[in-house]
Amino acid sequence: MKTLFTSVVLCGALVVSSSFAEEKATXQTAQSVVTTQAEAQVAPAVVSDKLNINTATASEIQKSLTGIGAKKAEAIVQYREKHGNFXNAEQLLEVQGIGKATLEKNRDRIIF
């Protein structure tokens, strides 16, 4: 009888501990999925030495691109807000104040 009681207690302890472990693993997995999704939704404007022209602020554009001051950087942001994201580098030529020389200086620094 004593052995039966001990066996029942041990089995109960195993069942309870395994359900706690399963809940903890499920909670950790859900938390990591939420964190990963949140990180994926925010595309960084500057990736190493590249600037995402579609997500960068005027300040980031000014700091990262050669020959772009505050006014041109703001013009890029305003153009993007009015016309949508840039699909290629040549579209920057449509922004007032951005010419071919400025585009060529920065072409390798821009990503979309």
Curated annotation (Swiss-Prot):
Q: Does the keyword DNA repair apply?
A: no
Superkingdom is Bacteria
For this protein, the record's Pfam families field holds: HHH_3
Q: Which residues form the signal peptide?
A: 1-21
Q: Which SUPFAM superfamilies match?
A: RuvA domain 2-like
Query: Quick one: a GO cellular component term?
Result: type II protein secretion system complex
HhH domain location: 49-79, 80-109
Query: What keywords is this UniProt entry annotated with?
Result: Repeat, Signal
Q: Which InterPro entries match?
A: Competence_ComEA_HhH, Endo/Exo/Phosphatase_dom_1, RuvA_2-like
One biological-process term from Gene Ontology?
protein secretion by the type II secretion system
Protein name according to UniProt: Uncharacterized protein HI_1008
